[in-house]
Amino acid sequence: MAGNTIGQLFRVTTFGESHGLALGCIVDGVPPGIPLTEADLQHDLDRRRPGTSRYTTQRREPDQVKILSGVFEGVTTGTSIGLLIENTDQRSQDYGAIKDLFRPGHADYTYEQKYGLRDYRGGGRSSARETAMRVAAGAIAKKYLAAKFGIVIRGCLTQMGDIPLAIKDWNQVEQNPFFCPDPDKIDALDELMRGLKKEGDSIGAKVTVVADGVPPGLGEPVFDRLDADIAHALMSINAVKGVEIGDGFEVVKLRGSENRDEITKDGFQSNHAGGILGGISSGQQIVANIALKPTSSITVPGHTINRFGEEVEMITKGRHDPCVGIRAVPIAEAMLAIVLMDHFMRQRAQNGDVTTTIPRW
C-alpha cells in the first residue's frame, strides 16, 4: 500500500487498522523548538473520538495519544515525531459472520479485488478509525500555524440530510453534539437522529471548514495548486464524495460579473473563490465544503454477494455512526491544517525572501 503519506516538506504517514493493536503515525518536517505535549494533541482527538454522545458510535476508545519521539524537554527537536494510539475497545466477534460477505457501499469488495484478501474486522485499514492519527498530526500543524502566523482553522456541520445549517454563531459549535453553528436547528437534528436510530438507517451530511489569517502566496502551480492539494486531502477522508472550494458548484448559476471577486483599495469585495486564485492563497478566508455519504453500516437488510458469487441478504452488525459527518468536523480541520503547514514550508523554502509592494488586507 503506497498511499499512506501526505505532504512534501511537512509529511504525515499513518499506519494501523480498526481492530489492530494500535494506530500510529510519523510526522516529518516539524520545525525545532515548538512547545508540544500530548495534551496539545488530545483536545482535538477528544472532539473526534467515538462514544462521546448518543448520536455517534458507542465504541468507547479513550484515544490517548503517546508521543514516542521528536520531543525533548517539552519542545520539538526537528526530528521525526512518532505518535501512537492503542485500540482498547475492539469487538471483532461482531464481524465474524461477514468475513465471506462484501458489505454493500463499503470497501470490502474493492480491497479484496486489489489485494486478494482483506481484514474484515471493522473494515481494517479502510475504516475511519485511521483518521485519529490525522487529527493528532493536524493538531501539531494547527498549533504551529496559530502561534507563528495567527491562523485559525475551524469547521462545522452545515447540512444534515435536507436540513441546512447556517453559520450563525461559531461559539455554538462546541456547545452541542452536532458541531452545529445554528442553535435554532438543534432540536430538528435531534429529532432526525432519533428517527434514524429507530429505523436502523443513516444520513449524509455537509461539513464546512475555513481558515482565517492565511497570507497571500501559498500554493505551487500548476499541479500542486493550493486548492488542488486541499481537495486531495479532504477527498481522502472516509465517506467524502464531493469537495467544493469557495462557492463550488454554485458558480454554474453565476455570471462572470457576479462571480469575480472585485478589488478596491479597501480589499476584496467578495469571496466566491474561497480565498484561492490561480491555485494561490489570496489572503482572504479559505473556505471548503465536503459532502459525506450516509454510512452503509445499517441494520436495514440489504443485498450483496459472498466471495463465492452467491447472492445473500445481510444486516451489518457492530457499532456505527448514524451520521459520519458529525465526527468528520475535526478530521476536515486537521487535513486543511496539514496542507497549509506543508505549503508554508514549501513557500519558505523557495520564496522566503520575496517581498512585494502590493497591498495586503
From Swiss-Prot:
Any GO MF annotation of the entry: FMN binding
Keyword field contains Amino-acid biosynthesis: yes
Pathway(s) it belongs to: Metabolic intermediate biosynthesis; chorismate biosynthesis; chorismate from D-erythrose 4-phosphate and phosphoenolpyruvate: step 7/7
Enzyme Commission identifier(s): 4.2.3.5
One Pfam family it belongs to: Chorismate_synt
Cofactor annotation: FMNH2
Domain of life of the source: Bacteria
Function: This reaction introduces a second double bond into the aromatic ring system.
Name this polypeptide is given: Chorismate synthase
UniProt organism field: Klebsiella pneumoniae (strain 342)
Gene: aroC
